[in-house]
From Swiss-Prot:
Listed transmembrane segments: none
GO cellular component: cytoplasm
Keyword Ribonucleoprotein appears in the UniProt entry: no
Main location (coarse class): cytoplasm
Gene3D superfamilies xrefs: GroES chaperonin
Name recorded for this polypeptide: Co-chaperonin GroES
Length: 95
């Protein structure tokens, strides 16, 4: 991975989902859902308080998370398509 996120940013890879209608048409899975599942690939160091104390992020590389649909920015990392989101965009860590 060539991307190293800064601050409270997190690099994730969204799981691709597709649905088919009864007649076989493929629908874009994430287009109508409110949330998406993603795997955390890399995390920033965290955020600093006004006093300079570093607060680490609550997730780590390898975690599966539930993210708001439409959150973040899509970028290319070599041949891979990943997204950079903020920790606040994560709704839950999946167990």
């Amino acid at each position: 991975m060539a991307l190293k996120p800064l601050g409270d940013r997190i690099v994730v890879h969204f799981e691709e989902t597709e649905e088919k209608t009864a007649s076989g048409f493929v629908l874009a899975g994430a287009s109508h859902e409110a949330t998406k599942t993603a795997e955390v690939l890399a995390v920033g160091e965290g955020i600093r308080t006004l006093t300079g104390e570093l607060i680490a992020l609550s997730v780590a590389a390898g975690d599966k998370v539930l993210v708001e649909n439409g959150a973040g920015v899509n970028v290319k990392d070599g041949d891979d398509s990943v997204s950079i989101i903020r920790e606040a965009d994560i709704l839950a860590v999946l167990a």
